[in-house]
């Protein structure tokens, strides 16, 4: 059987706890008590000498102690029935045939129902506000810049841009080999500009810089005066 001593009756100080001092009957009728439906059921069972009460007995106890519930009975009575059915701390006890008069089964506390004590603090049957638990931070994923590899952090884009030209000159894998030199029979266009025939055949780019004598004769200096060692290097 459930030990009713765990729920001292003197903790149900209805008149003092439910309403402010000096409250009128009208205020009590309009003010909803600060008790949950589970607490109201527990109070009704606790006040019974046998430790059990019928559903109608629960209704009578609530309306007798709390005038607020005397109106709109259908709504809160449905809530009482739902809490009795869904809460494992309340069990239904059938009537004994031939020995008890009346209708309906009894309701009492389930044996070893210590979890009901956790619903209230120090015998206080008032409503408890829901406490918000600490926010749990999910596992942090890789940042937008890319995950850090085992070899170390990746270099910033600016550094990669500076290193790209140097690494290209070192012969990265997959690059094509350098072009082979032109055969000796064909002169490279760059070498052609420095040949003697090209210099003699091209017009003078700076005719104003010629000496007066050469400008009048329209001739070029002799080839032996030209430093040919520039083309033999």
From Swiss-Prot:
InterPro entries per the UniProt record, alphabetical: Fork_head_dom, FOX_domain-containing, TF_fork_head_CS_2, WH-like_DNA-bd_sf, WH_DNA-bd_sf
Portion annotated as DNA-binding: 32-130
Any one cellular-component term (Gene Ontology): nucleus
Protein's UniProt keywords contain Nucleus: yes
Composition bias, Basic residues: 125-134
Predominant subcellular localization, coarse grouping: nucleus
Gene3D superfamilies the UniProt entry points to: Winged helix-like DNA-binding domain superfamily/Winged helix DNA-binding domain (1.10.10.10)
Descriptive protein name: Forkhead box protein L3
Gene encoding the protein: FOXL3
